[in-house]
Amino acid sequence: MSDLAAALEIVGARWSLLVVERLLDGPQRYGDLQRDLGVPTNVLATRLRELEAAGVLTRLPLRHNTRAYALTDRGLALRGTILALGEWGRGDVTGEI
C-alpha cells in the first residue's frame, strides 16, 4: 500500500477531513460538530469513532456526561494538508490541474 493510500484509509472517508478541519479551531462538542457540518448523526458518530481509533482525535470528558472532541498531535499535523486542499479547491494553486 502506498503512503497516500494509507493516509486515505484514515481520512479519505466522506466528512472525515471536514471534521478535522472544524477541530483545527479547537475542541468541539458532538452537537456543535453535527450542527455546523450538517452531517447525519450516524455518519458523524462513525467518523469520530474511526478518527479516534486512528489516533487523529481524542474525546474529552465534560460535565453532565457530555464529551468534546479535540485533535491529537497526529490530527494537528493535517493542518497544512487541509489548508493546501482548501487553496486547491479555490483554484489558488499555481500551475495546471
Name each region found by the language model.
Residues 12, 63-85:
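Basic, amphipathic "hinge/linker" alpha-helix immediately C-terminal to the N-terminal HTH DNA-binding motif
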Residues 59:
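Short beta-strand "wing" residues that participate in macromolecule-binding interfaces
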Residues 47:
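Residues within the DNA-recognition helix of helix-turn-helix
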Residues 55:
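Glycine-centered, phosphate/nucleic-acid-interacting loop/turn motifs that mediate DNA/RNA or nucleotide
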Residues 80-97:
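C-terminal regulatory/oligomerization modules of transcriptional regulators
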Residues 2-43:
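N-terminal helix-turn-helix DNA-binding core of bacterial DNA-binding proteins
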Residues 26-27, 76, 91:
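Short, charged/polar surface micro-motifs in flexible loops or helix N-caps
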